[in-house]
Amino acid sequence: MNDALKTYLKGICWFLLSLVTSSVNDVISKYLGTRLHSFEVAFFRFLFSSIVLLPFVVYYGKSTLKTRHPVIHVLRGLLLFFGMTSWTYGLTIAPVTTATVISFSIPLFTLILAVFILNENIIWQRWVVTVVGFIGLVVMLKPHTKDFNPEILYLILAAISFAMLDIINKKFVVKESMLSMLFYSAIVTAIVSLPVSMEYWITPSSFELTLLFVLGSSGSFILFFLLKAFTMVDATATAPYRYLELVISAIAAYFIFNEFPDKSTAHGAVIIIPATLFIMYSEKKSMSSKHESQ
């Protein structure tokens, strides 16, 4: 095995670790959401996330928290609060696999938002594929049938919030340190979550607190795993493996919640996955063309 292949395989392994951690987070969130309100889950999740990040702040020094965009950090925190509370609540309504497929639609929302917020020009092929992707969502959610539960739309609202976060990150991540973006968004989300969570407060058990700590700290681990992966392989090379999360989620949901993906989820995934893959590869090609022309 040559060195290039070894590096590639290591990078993919790091990326797969991020997928496993993400799936574990969804399973934990669904479990906690059956007893604790999503506001309270968000409060503890980001409180523990802030605590976990504190040693890194001390190590790198206060200067790493200096920011020119405090309003942007507040906006990110508000979006994260809305997105995570909607996602946690949605997980109590829908199967984990359905939520996972909906998360695959985030690039579709990001593309549309980029047109209005970043004034990006989108080629017609990407518009066509985006429409196809949304058709996949409709196929999966079945809004035209009596089985449709409107509360599943909380997951769609969460996906839109995460797409908004992607847009903000795309515009400001080069101007801010990664640590400051993580720390401030966690602090803001915890602060915003506290007063609303008091309305629905249920004192967590020691086991639930342990799970909440895992939930809070694992977000940083996901970022670490992704950064390690992207130092070894190109982000585009990991794109096909992104959808293994559906397999991981399906296995976890089956053994823990006795859930099994229905046909509509499978049909929706078959439509959404190729659509988002095309968008990612198209964006990569567009970025490469821009660099070559400079």
Swiss-Prot record:
According to the UniProt entry, how is activity regulated? Transport is inhibited by S-adenosylethionine and to a lesser extent by S-adenosylhomocysteine. Unlike eukaryotic transporters is not inhibited by sinfungin. Also inhibited by 2.4-dinitrophenol, suggesting transport is an energy-dependent process.
Pfam families the UniProt entry points to: EamA (PF00892)
Is Cell inner membrane one of the keywords?
Answer: yes
The membrane topology term of the UniProt record is:
Multi-pass membrane protein
* The entry's keywords: Amino-acid transport, Cell inner membrane, Cell membrane, Membrane, Repeat, Transmembrane, Transmembrane helix, Transport
- The answer on whether this UniProt entry bears the keyword Cell membrane reads yes
Per its UniProt entry, which superkingdom is the organism in? Bacteria
Name all EamA domain ranges. 23-141, 160-280
Transmembrane regions:
8-28, 41-61, 72-91, 98-118, 121-141, 148-168, 178-198, 207-227, 237-257, 260-280
| First-listed, main subcellular location of the protein, grouped into a coarse class | membrane
Q: Name one GO cellular component term.
A: plasma membrane
Which cell locations does it reside in? Cell inner membrane
Q: Member of which family?
A: Belongs to the drug/metabolite transporter (DMT) superfamily. 10 TMS drug/metabolite exporter (DME) (TC 2.A.7.3) family.
The name this protein goes by in its record: S-adenosylmethionine uptake transporter
Native organism is Rickettsia typhi (strain ATCC VR-144 / Wilmington)
Q: Which gene encodes it?
A: sam
